Amino acid sequence: MQNISRAAAIVGVAEADEIGYLENRKSDLQLNEEACYNAIEDAGLNKSDVDGLFAAGNTLGLAEHMGIHPKFTDSTSVGGSSFVIHAGHALAAIAAGYCEVALVTHGMAGHSRRFFEGSRESGAANSPGAQFESPYGFIGAPINYSMACARYMHEFGEDRSREAMAEVAISTAQVGRPQPQSTHPRPKGGDTADHVL
């Protein structure tokens, strides 16, 4: 198998103009578009250079809204890790010659959406999730992550895995907290596995 790890480089990184709890309502599309334009600018490119688009939503709608014409799109959606998977997919697409400049984006108006009455977006009432998952409380990221944790604990043992998962939470918080956009202050109990557990 060919090693493609050096087939591409990340040359631009950016966020939407506002993140966290927004004063004004913005859609997922607006946040994606802002982040895309900011990343393109950070890379020193033009939107016409982009020929690959990777997003966990409607890539064709985003491309149309931005006025770009990608040769390759990927809308794989696996929840909050989609953009991580898209980075790998973008690398593979570039190595295979499907595109030269890949734009990976993720934008979600989750925090700001809560503050606007009647703005809660939901799936169609006849979707499988609405019919067979939501009535039983199977909703959102906590459920999805807990399934992965349960599997990890089954494979590697409950005692060892609880502490390992606490360390992941601690290291994630330590990296994220110093960022200017962080919405999570330092916990009162400190960054210890005992406090997390």
Residue spans for each PLM region:
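Short glycine-enriched loops at secondary-structure junctions
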Residues: 56-60, 108-109
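Acyl-thioester C-C bond-transforming condensing/cleaving domain
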Residues: 2, 45-47, 69-197
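Short glycine-rich phosphate-binding loop at a beta-alpha junction
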Residues: 49-55
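Conserved donor sugar-nucleotide recognition element shared by glycan-biosynthetic enzymes
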Residues: 32, 59, 83
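Short catalytic helix/loop segments, enriched in acidic residues and glycine
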Residues: 23-43
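Condensing-enzyme catalytic core mediating Claisen C-C bond formation in acyl metabolism
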Residues: 1-29, 131, 155, 167-171
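Glycine-rich loop at the start of a catalytic domain that most often binds anionic cofactors/ligands
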Residues: 62-69
